Amino acid sequence: MTQELWRCGPFDFDLRDEPVIMGILNVTPDSFSDGGEHNALPDALAWAEKMRGDGARIIDVGGESTRPGATEVPLEEERSRVIPVVKALAKEGFCVSVDTSRPEIMLEAAEAGAAILNDVRAFERPGALEAAASTKLGLVIMHQGPFDPEKDVVEDAFRYLGRREEALLAAGVESERIAWDPGFGFGKTLEQNFEVLAASGRFLASGRPLLAALSRKGSLGRFTGRKNPHERAAASVAGALLAAERGARILRVHDVRETSDALAVLKAFGQADIRIDARGRS
């Protein structure tokens, strides 16, 4: 049974009713979709406020692009991009997630008021596991390869995430703090990406909440022919809805308003189904 509560520092998310939207806030010059758009602190705060108004309950702040081929930024640069934004958002009552793999940033973000650590390397960097365990924050672990078109990507991802969860538990992390991300768009073929999405039920067998991060990804662009990431909103919303229908409870997205509206319609249909079933049994 998948856990019903995700504990993230001072925030507890009830996952029984509807998915939680995590709005993406990249404070980078080179992120694949929105790099350079929110680098200045006032711009970042304004965009976060807009996303909150549109339905985002979590703001995911990233100071280093994780797109394939991106250049690693120095520690000091990531720190200067991320920590002031985290402090300002936390002061305004936001639930802040920080997309980082560096233990130094994890610890400073926790001190600055972050509630979630979102690590595409699943806390494998030296010191990251200990940094995560020393906090009470929510933790997201992600699978990203290595790329192998011949492997069973679903089972590979499931086993990898299971091992990383075991490492966190052994370090003293409570299971209610952990969420899984199968890593759509990371180290997978086009077909494997959609196998991971279709096999959401396999990951739910872990008992952990599932995070889906399909927003504006290149795989969606290849299917739709949309080379510009900004033109992939419709495909991104479709992917988010498919993930939600398959049990994903955290949706990491750029297009918050569109995703929120689509989820509202999906919920209305679900409630109509319940009423129809109830009448049929009466």
Where do the protein language model's features map onto the residues?
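Catalytic-pocket segment enriched in acidic/His residues
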Residues: 29
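Short coil-to-helix leader/linker segments, especially the first N-terminal amphipathic alpha-helix
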Residues: 1-11
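Catalytic domains of carbohydrate-active enzymes, especially glycoside hydrolases
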Residues: 46-62, 246
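Short acidic capping loops at alpha-helix termini that bridge into adjacent secondary structure
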Residues: 174-177
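Active-site-adjacent loop and "lid" segments of alpha/beta metabolic enzymes
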Residues: 8-10, 16, 33-47, 66-95, ...
